[in-house]
Amino acid sequence: MEIGKNVKRYDVLREHGGILKVTRGDVTTEYVSEFCGASHSRTQKNLFVDRSIKDKLDDILLCGIPKNTDYPKPSKWNAYYALVTTNSQPVSMPNIVVIDDFEKLVTETVDVVKLTGTGEQKEYQVLSPTEKEIPILPFDGAGLVTPECASRWAEELDCRSKRTGRRYIPSCFQFRCLPAVKGEAFTFDLKQFAREKGVSKIVDLGGREWDIFTDQIDMIVTKSQFKFWNLYLDNVGLFDCQKWKSAFEEEVHGYRRTFNVAKYADAPEDIRNTSLLSYQPLQTVRFTPEEAEQLVSDSVSTYERIKSSVDEFLKYCGVSEEAEYIKPYYQALQYNHALANDTYVRGKMQDDIKRMKNELLSGKQRIHGHYEVFCPDIYGLAEFAFGLEVKGLLPNPWTIYSKYWTERGVSEVDVIRNPHIAMEHRVCQVITSAEMQKWYKYQECTIVSSMYDTLAFALSGADYDGDTVCTTDNVQIINSVKRVMESGNGNLIVKDGESGKELKSVIISDVPGLMEVNARGYKNNIGSVIDRVTDLWTLSELYPECRKYIKIGTIVGAETIDFAKTGENASFPVEVLKFLKDKKKGYWMRYLEKNLAAAQNESLSMSNAEYFGGDPDKKKRFVDYDCNMNRLCHLAEQKIAEIDKQTEVVAGEEFDYRTLLSGNVHVNRDVYRKVQILQDEYKKLADGIRASYKSKDKNEKANISLRYRMFYEKCRAELLYIVPDIDKLLDMLILIYYTKRDFRDNQKSKDLLWNAFPEEMIARAKSENINKQVDFKKLSVKHHKNNLAESKKKRTGKITIASIDRSDCADNEVIFYKEDREEIRKLILKHKIVKRSDNQVKYERLIAVLLYLSRKMNMQTLTLRNNCPGELSYQNIAMLADVNNDFIKPALKSLKECGAINIETMQSGDLKIDVLYYGKPFGEVWFCTENYNQAGVKIRDYFRMDKAA
């Protein structure tokens, strides 16, 4: 269930025991709140399960933990209990030893932010830099697995190189195990280590001694990985590993628990040599003019190659690198370069090239470097596990081991991590030795870090449970980071003081109590914190106080991320919010994907302000401040403009659609009609998704992809039901889409063709036979299901205005009187707004619709949004009045000039409309309804051409 920012409905569910009733036909099913993990909380979602299975599900997931357990940190419980919802694959159960965490102190000069108070009274004070001892967990989130066990898992998971198909043993595995045992297991030869060091005994977290050989230990798990270790204690309060193992191995309700792997490291040959670095790491440094020129030139040269070569374009799309998903038309383009001149494929290429252009203009840079899993000094972890002095193999701070960079002779890299708020860069020396190559033998795709520095803390509080870091040898970035560090502006930022708020414990079976914690978590938004810090970086060269505010933002960001541990919300202090209140965004931000609509709206609002009377300059949303990102943006603009003048989008040989045909066919009339219907459905689906798309959250993207995939599967089934011969059908579809006027000139229309029949279209591009048999029985079942689904959802002719439906005025009945009709007609005639009778009817309908909506909203201001099908928009007003969309804007201007309405243009380009003409609410009733669709019918039926004056 998606909660969103409005938690009123969620509160009602909480008050009713967290039970959600869903009715399908005549059957009502009760669902109950069960999971709200960290990712759910970030996206304001809650996972409900069928109430009838909840008790059994809890019996399995709790793994022996009593249901009446009173847990002191409910936010942590919610986060870890929901780990089971992540996707993973079962592997053979390892023999595990759970050991304590190793702690140590490192001394470093840090910037301190002192925290006092709690909640809205929380205050942040930035203190002077000071030298301080920082406690660290050098192996936080990390464990070790023997090569023998790793080899078994690799076989069970079928770990193969994406590029070559070679079997390999991954450097590490991200694992999941009940209850809430999670982290990264790094491949390390524990037994060889024990033999060479002459040791074999390992003491676990509860003080019990194990022998790696006689007990056949496969894996070492640290306390930081076993989240609920303190719920498995013996009579004297010590961790009892056997108590957990017995509960884990017990069969419950016919279910046997498993040890699972969620992800594992790539094969070395699959590592990409380049990465697209986001704007965040670039905004925290300052480049010299020469550095900026070189950095932008390197990225723009990639743009030039992609634009001028089909092969380079395909390489950019990942076709030659076995990416997880390649769009079917690009797979086809790999075999038939002539498709680059097909208007549909060419349009897709232009869209992707434009997307890359916007990435460059928004400051993103393509660099030599890549992401790998962040790894601790696992030699030191092995020393600790066997009770030896913990030294590790990386003896100095700010050193790393990387097989990738060592093989390329690189001795210095910048290490970067997102989310990047303050200055999550650290320049490290790449070192190696014979001992490192021996003991880090399996660490082919990780960045091994030293235990003598605060690198993990500096990288936005990273740990070793699967976090990834980017490393690059880019000289411009490395030199700029060094300058920042030398100036003292790159110190580690730490918090002094904790919240004084006492957190209330919750019984883990108390569903409403846990939901209350969820509701608090929904208020947190790390994205908004990062956005505000970005604004501060944009202004930092103009306003010295921004540096102080950025340090505060770093702590606010850390507190927001740590909600699962603390259960307390975090927000910027009022001082910072007041500073940012009237500040515009940087010019470069207009090119960010999330701001493209805002940039268009800026142009629209400035145009509207000029059109309706106002100051266009006040509508500007992006300002050309003197800052690092704006300078990079302008450099990219200049270079890309020069390339665009000289280079057309790549053109191959001439394309002839007939090369995709396999024979001579005539288009079946039923197929043509069905394609028309499906195209209309596709447009409605795409419009609806576009209107409701709110974020770039991967879960939302996955949901959107699923909706499209289900639609394409429906299209495939419906068309094959008409013509089961797939070769004939495909020939008909190709003829329809390439020769029929309704489709050939519509660039997006071929989405259905390429996505409903992807493999077949690729085969046609390769001039291969399809030779597929269609199972008509299965096809008939799908067709029947599609018909049932279609009949359920048909609501012909109705629109939805969500802003009204979810408001307090949703149930308001509106009375229209016959006198209203006459007054509306008099208004139009009196002011001589129109001369033609057909336009008179349109104006009458428009003012009647606006008057109805205004009365329904208790005469509140109406917000008219641009291109938002689910809101009060030009489109919905036009549909209610049955007029053309293009008619609305000039008509509103005329109504404003005659005093019927007042219009204010917003920064977004939206219009605020106050209906000044109230009508005369008295006399004989014309109609009374709370339904705006019914009101639209009444208005359209009365104001007609045959009744015009």
Residues covered by each model-derived region:
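Beta-strand-enriched accessory nucleic-acid recognition/scaffold domains that flank the catalytic cores
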Residues: 1-461, 468, 474-849, 864, ...
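Winged helix-turn-helix DNA-binding recognition segment
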Residues: 789, 858-916
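Short amphipathic alpha-helical elements of helix-turn-helix/winged-helix folds
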Residues: 848-856
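Short, cationic-aromatic polyanion-contact patches
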Residues: 906-938
